[in-house]
Amino acid sequence: MAKLGPGQGLGCEAAEGSLVPSRKREYKPCGKHTEGKRPLYAIGFNFMDARYYDVFATVGGNRVTTYRCLENGSFALLQAYVDEDKDESFYTLSWARDHVDGSPLLVAAGSNGIIRVINCATEKLAKSFVGHGDSINEIRTQPLKPSLIISASKDESVRLWNVHTGICILIFAGAGGHRNEVLSVDFHPSDIERFASCGMDNTVKIWSMKEFWLYVDKSYSWTDLPSKFPTKYVQFPVLIAAVHSNYVDCTRWLGDFILSKSVDNEIVLWEPKTKEQSPGEGSIDILQKYPVPECDIWFIKFSCDFHFNQLAIGNREGKIYVWEVQSSPPVLIARLYNQQCKSPIRQTAVSFDGSTILGAGEDGTIWRWDEVDHPSSRN
């Protein structure tokens, strides 16, 4: 299966954003909170339930913590889960929802390769999923069906799980799969059967679950042991794209387009053009580039607000760049920094409306910036 490189689409010149901030929205540094000395690798707001839009979670070491953003610019600690294995190091988290009673679920995983599902309503560990043969680098939740999650692993596979029944439904690996660690995954926002993955083999792959969707349906009504479920292997993606020349450590859909980044100080927006009748064939067209200075180390992930208006990404010097995602050429809204923040920002979290931006630091600190003219920042 041929890899598609850049410039095989329409051949248009990619629009590159300027690093001069437009100051369309201005932010001020607010609270900070240091959890400990172990790095924070992930942070995320709960977009799965409108009741909890101001709630976010972090993972660092063997600890998963939830907080509420207060209007005065500080945080309120809500819950903390400490894994029984003191050597566990969580790398990723994702919010999900129980499809029966609507309870907020927090899913986390890391170096042990075990997925932990925490029920935040009962404050208990609800389930643990075992199956991956190595550490898990990212988990994402299906926004249209928030009881489905997908996990990307060092074992070169991606797995689809039902958090309600505990079933591993599909495994994406094999002949057309990744050839090194899978670092990031993301579900298509409106096509429930499609997702993208990327990793250390320098590729982004687009997968379709269309032919296997009956197994997804079956996973909800399965009454036997989860281990007896007829889990299926999916070996071939519908598209393999070589947009980058190094590790690809973060990918997100923007409508039918894809945002992805490597270790070369930029995020790329591109259009995949797949041919449903000919898996693996198609073309890609690079549309835009969002420069991010000093972003040349791997495992730095970006995030967006709920409506994908703003994108925030940290760098190895502790700065955060906030881009207006959908303008062309891209517009840099703001460059955020705090004199005290000197270590890499591994992941950001942008609030529902973009008025609060959080950074998870490698020094174990959560950093917060609030929009200056927003009602919540006037106290």
From Swiss-Prot:
It holds the Pfam family WD40. The keyword Translocase does not apply. GO terms for biological process: heterochromatin formation; negative regulation of transcription by RNA polymerase II. SMART domains: WD40 (SM00320). Widely expressed. Expressed in the embryo sac before pollination. After pollination, its expression persists, predominantly in the embryo and at lower levels in the endosperm. Keywords: Chromatin regulator, Nucleus, Repeat, Repressor, Transcription, Transcription regulation, WD repeat. It is found in: Nucleus. WD repeats lie at residues 85-128, 131-171, 177-217, 243-280, 292-333, 340-378. It comes from the Eukaryota. GO terms for cellular component: ESC/E(Z) complex. Its main location: nucleus. InterPro entries: G-protein_beta_WD-40_rep, PcG_WD-repeat, WD40/YVTN_repeat-like_dom_sf, WD40_repeat_CS, WD40_repeat_dom_sf, WD40_rpt. Belongs to the WD repeat ESC family. Polycomb group (PcG) protein. PcG proteins act by forming multiprotein complexes, which are required to maintain the transcriptionally repressive state of homeotic genes throughout development. PcG proteins are not required to initiate repression, but to maintain it during later stages of development. They probably act via the methylation of histones, rendering chromatin heritably changed in its expressibility. This is Polycomb group protein FIE2. It comes from Zea mays (Maize). The gene is FIE2.
